[in-house]
Design a protein with these regions (language model features):
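N-terminal single-pass transmembrane signal-anchor helix
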Residues: 7-34, 46
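Short linear sequence signals and composition-biased patches located at protein termini or domain-edge surfaces
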Residues: 8, 39, 45-49, 53-60, ...
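Solvent-exposed, flexible loop/coil residues
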Residues: 15, 42, 54, 176
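Autoprocessing Asn-cyclization modules and mimics
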Residues: 119-247
């Protein structure tokens, strides 16, 4: 009787199950390693992007803070008009249309002193805004606002001579030859046109007008509402009332262009020393960028507003902005880390000597804690702290260049 040979082709059921289990284990391990690698890459790339964003923000903010008061003629502040209400800064002109304005419509310029009656609004080179900002969701405290003011050294507006000043206009002329006081920033070979598209005056700009009244120097700050070219290097700059920042008040008894009225020559020529200079009043504050889907509270965003121009976002995801200031009290005592810059004690903002950035905090907008690089799930956060010298606030130019 013949012997039947067993069929050895294929796998048994047990062998098939074992091979499937081993294959699933190998593939699962590979997928897990790949997922961990992707998560680690995401965390690292997100962290690098946050660092880059914060570095760019810090460069812009810290440079502005270091320029506080640069080029301003007075170390004691510049008086502003108040007959039609106090001028404002920050959150304008789009405050009403956008949420989280503190207070609604803008922040009024501070008085010369907290106890001054009546209030004389004054522009300083540095204006602290302690707890005048929004409260970011999840934060226990209000954020701060900070405003710095300095002159524009690129736009050669001081090279123009003033031909006439009325209550609402200033007429300037480009002289030939240029006066000795005309300083051009390289590579400029001639002053730019007053209405030049890139650097010229536009509505919302602030102009510092200096002249002489009764033998005494006088300074007025006005907001540009229009610029017209008259030909031959002659321009009419309009400072009409009802401006965004409430700077133009023709009927004010002080600190308005009405007190500087002069020209045209030869009947009532303007002083040869009269000049115009553009200044930058730059405010930083936090604002909640609305959720495009209208679902969440929005994204906390650091905003930057220059003069009366539309505010622009600097960086999204900034959740805290706080400052303190080192200054001197009325008796000369050193006050360290004061939130309001000593304003509540009657101290002038021009006595501030150091700006302390207590918190400039940025947070990731998407959870980045997805790998072993982070101990718990959550958001990545960076907090910047530094101090900046306010060296220009106490500077006074004792040397006047004759025209």
């Amino acid at each position: 009787m013949g012997r039947r040979s067993a069929n050895s082709s294929g796998f048994s059921l047990i062998e098939l199950l074992v091979s499937l289990a081993v294959g699933a284990l190998v593939i699962g391990s590979a997928v897990q390693i790949f997922t961990r690698g992707l998560n680690a890459t995401f965390v690292v790339s997100q962290r690098a992007q946050m660092q880059q964003d914060l570095r760019a923000t810090s460069d812009l903010l810290f440079k502005d803070l270091s320029l506080a008061g640069a080029g301003l003629p007075s170390a004691t502040g510049i008086l502003l008009p108040s007959a039609a209400g106090r001028p404002i800064y920050g959150f304008a002109p789009s405050c009403v249309a956008k949420n989280n304005c503190i207070p609604g419509g803008g922040i009024a310029y501070p008085c010369t002193s907290v106890a001054a009656v009546p209030c004389n609004p004054t522009l300083y080179g540095l204006i602290p805004g302690w707890q005048l900002g929004i409260t970011v969701p999840g934060s226990p405290n209000r954020s701060d606002v900070v405003t710095v003011v300095y002159t524009d050294t690129v736009f050669a507006l001081p090279c123009y001579t003033i031909q006439a000043i009325t209550a609402t206009t200033v007429i300037v002329q480009l002289p030939a030859p240029l006066p000795a006081t005309c300083i051009l920033t390289p590579p400029l070979v001639a002053p730019q046109a007053v209405n030049a598209p890139a650097v010229g005056l536009t509505p919302g700009d602030l102009v510092l007008v200096q002249s002489t009244v009764g033998g005494n120097s006088a300074t007025v700050i006005a907001e540009v509402t229009g610029v017209a070219a008259n030909g031959g290097g002659n321009y009419t700059v309009t400072f009409a009332g009802g401006d965004t920042l409430n700077m133009n008040q023709p009927g004010a008894p002080a600190a308005s262009l009405t007190q500087l009225v002069c020209g045209p020559a030869p009947a009532a020529a303007c002083p040869a020393t009269a000049s115009t200079t553009r200044i930058f009043a730059t405010s930083y504050y936090l604002w909640m960028l609305p959720d495009p889907l209208g679902v969440g509270a929005g994204t906390p965003t650091l905003m930057r507003q220059v003069n009366g121009q539309t505010p622009v976002p600097v960086q999204e995801g900034v959740v805290n902005l706080q400052f303190t200031y080192d200054t001197y009290g009325p008796t000369g005592a050193l006050l360290n880390a004061v939130g309001d810059g000593g304003y509540s004690t009657g101290t002038s903002f021009n006595l501030i000597r150091k700006i302390n950035v207590v918190h400039l905090t940025t947070r990731s907008q998407v959870s980045g804690a997805k790998s072993g690089l982070m101990t718990t799930n959550g958001y990545q956060t960076f907090d910047t702290q530094t101090s900046i010298s306010a060296r220009n606030l106490s500077y006074q130019n004792r040397y006047v260049v004759a025209p």
